[in-house]
Curated annotation (Swiss-Prot):
Similarity annotation: Belongs to the NRAMP family.
Cellular component terms per the entry's GO annotation: endosome membrane; late endosome membrane; lysosomal membrane; membrane; phagocytic vesicle membrane; plasma membrane
Compositional bias of kind Polar residues: 8-17
Organism of origin: Canis lupus familiaris
Name recorded for this polypeptide: Natural resistance-associated macrophage protein 1
Transmembrane segments: 55-75, 82-102, 140-160, 165-185, 194-214, 241-261, 287-307, 347-367, 395-415, 433-453, 465-485, 493-513
Length: 547
């Protein structure tokens, strides 16, 4: 095993050269027709000094990225964590957010240093078959995330209309509102980023209101936040802890963030400018994810205070004796612990704290669904253009993604019930966790390559932390598989699972192999994969590499 600074990696021409910005294609018109069509200029300030003006110029991509930490899937995971474990899992939420920040830091750094997003670099470095499989997994993650947004938005419309808008009607409304929000592109990048900021503010105010009225016990809350323990916890709490990690770190978000940072004008021929951009993007991402953490904390704390170990019978009685007594029927009359979801959670808030709490909850849920819709659209566009070099209009792209998301959701709503819809939301959180290696492994691979990143390649500490994240994710996924296999309804499903597992493990093994090569394990470097050690020669940079 050799060190990271192989001398050949310095002397050979490479894709990530800072003095000569790379280009994977001959000079063409830009592929982007949205977001990246406009570049935000960075003001000149005195070198070596911190500038709020400059921080403001860099502010935007991190907050758009943070919306994936606040989508309806996260909200459902939060409220279930509170209802199942009280405040005991707040420390898991905290450290999952920190791990998410570390992954997003790598994504931003890759985009700043190379001038290309993760999808584009995957297109350059991976052969056709693994590249195509990798693209399909990320598209699956995007569709899964979009399904969660459809579910959350539909439930929000149902709550706001007091049930007058059926769930299937709310699902269909999401088709229209998505295209409406896409028109925001026409009003400029900063206005679009400001709109996302407004949606995040709405979530902070609405869920913060619930936190204030619930008045959680602050001492117990701080203990749950700062002490990494879970006294008296069993399998349900462990499953919920795993669900928190799966909901927080989203695979498509890593691809998204690496593209969003390209919206700022950065002189990549100057190392100080790159170093400065990395610093400001890290500060902005830290602020954005701090805001998202507190919003998630509000939700966990509210349900941990009001609904921890609550029984269905108690929930029924509370609602039956409130002004929202018509909703009491959604809780079965038994002594089992209530299994809350984003619909029942809103109803319970209204029953306990008054109707205003229900409607405010629904507004926050609507903001979460709508903001996630837009970022999911951008992620899909960046991933498709990066991997396939295929240019689609944003309308065609969102129509494809939303159609794939709406069809299964409508089928569940029409032929099953609300409980199955919420169960689908939980299953989608599991899916995001299973697909996470297909984002973390590539970002760890490419940000660890000195030939690509030069002096900005990962150091030993960064490699160790990211490798720990990868090992944690793999352990979580293995645990999920062991837990869910016995619940398969028919032996024939085992054949399907086995076939999918072969593809999954094969692609994961390939990505791990190339990751080791990028870390300097030269013994594994086949002649066809030398570019993971030394970068791409000029002929490959010009798009002439085959496969």
């Amino acid at each position: 095993m050799t060190g990271d600074k192989d001398p050949q990696s310095v002397s050979r021409p490479n894709y990530g050269s800072i003095s000569h910005p790379p280009s994977s294609e001959p000079q063409q018109e830009p592929l982007r027709t949205t977001y990246l069509s406009e570049k935000i200029p960075i003001p000149d300030t005195e070198p070596g000094t911190f500038s709020l003006r400059k921080l403001w110029a860099f502010t935007g991509p991190g907050f758009l990225m943070s919306i994936a930490f606040l989508d309806p899937g996260n909200i459902e995971s939060d409220l279930q964590a509170g209802a199942v474990a009280g405040f005991k899992l707040l420390w898991v939420l905290l450290w999952a957010t920190v791990l998410g920040l570390l992954c997003q830091r790598l994504a931003a750094r890759l985009g700043v240093v190379t001038g290309k997003d993760l999808g584009e670099i995957c297109h350059l470095y991976y052969p056709k078959v693994p590249r195509t499989l990798l693209w399909l997994t990320i598209e699956l993650a995007i569709v899964g995330s979009d399904m969660q947004e459809v579910i959350g938005t539909a439930i929000a419309f149902s709550l706001l209309s007091a049930g007058r808008i059926p769930l299937w009607g709310g699902v269909l409304i999401t088709i229209v509102d998505t295209f409406f929000f896409l028109f925001l592109d026409n009003y400029g990048l900063r206005k679009l980023e400001a709109f996302f900021g407004i949606l995040i503010t709405i979530m902070a105010l609405t869920f913060g209101y619930e936190y204030v009225v619930a008045r959680p016990a602050q001492v117990a809350l701080l203990q749950g936040l700062l002490l990494p323990s879970c006294p008296g916890c069993g399998r349900p709490e462990l499953l919920q802890a795993v669900g928190i990690v799966g909901a927080i770190i989203m695979p498509h978000n890593i691809y998204l963030h690496s593209a969003l940072v390209k919206s700022r004008e950065i002189d990549r021929s100057r190392r100080p400018d790159i170093r400065e951009a990395n610093m400001y993007f890290l500060i902005e991402a830290s602020i954005a994810l701090s805001v998202s953490f507190f919003i998630n904390l509000f939700v966990v704390a509210v349900f941990g205070q009001a609904f921890y170990q609550q029984t269905n019978e108690a929930a029924f009685n509370v609602c039956a004796n409130s002004s929202l007594h018509d909703y009491a029927k959604i809780f079965p009359r038994n002594n089992l612990t209530v299994e809350v979801d984003i619909y029942q959670g809103g109803v319970m808030l209204g029953c306990v704290f008054g109707p205003a709490a229900l409607y405010i909850w629904a507004v926050g849920l609507l903001a979460a669904g709508q903001s996630s819709t837009m970022t999911g659209t951008y992620a899909g566009q960046f991933v498709m253009e990066g991997f396939l070099r295929l240019r689609w209009s944003r309308f065609a792209r969102v129509l494809l993604t939303r159609s794939c998301a709406i069809l299964p959701t409508v089928l569940v709503v029409v032929f099953r019930d609300l409980k199955d819809l919420s169960g689908l939301n939980d299953l989608l959180n599991v899916l995001q966790s299973l697909l996470l290696p297909f984002a973390v492994l590539p970002i760890l691979t490419f940000t660890s390559m000195p030939a690509l990143m030069q002096e900005f390649a990962n150091g030993r500490l960064s490699k160790a932390i990211t490798s720990f994240i990868m090992a944690l994710v793999c352990a979580i996924n293995l645990y999920f598989v062991v837990i869910y296999l016995p619940s398969l309804p028919h032996p024939a499903y085992f054949i399907l699972v086995a076939l999918l597992a072969i593809v999954y493990l094969g692609l994961t093994t390939y990505l791990v192999w190339t990751c080791f090569i990028a870390h300097g394990v030269t013994l594994l470097a086949h002649s066809s994969h030398q570019h993971f050690l030394y970068g791409l020669p000029d002929v490959e940079e010009k798009g002439k590499i085959s496969g």
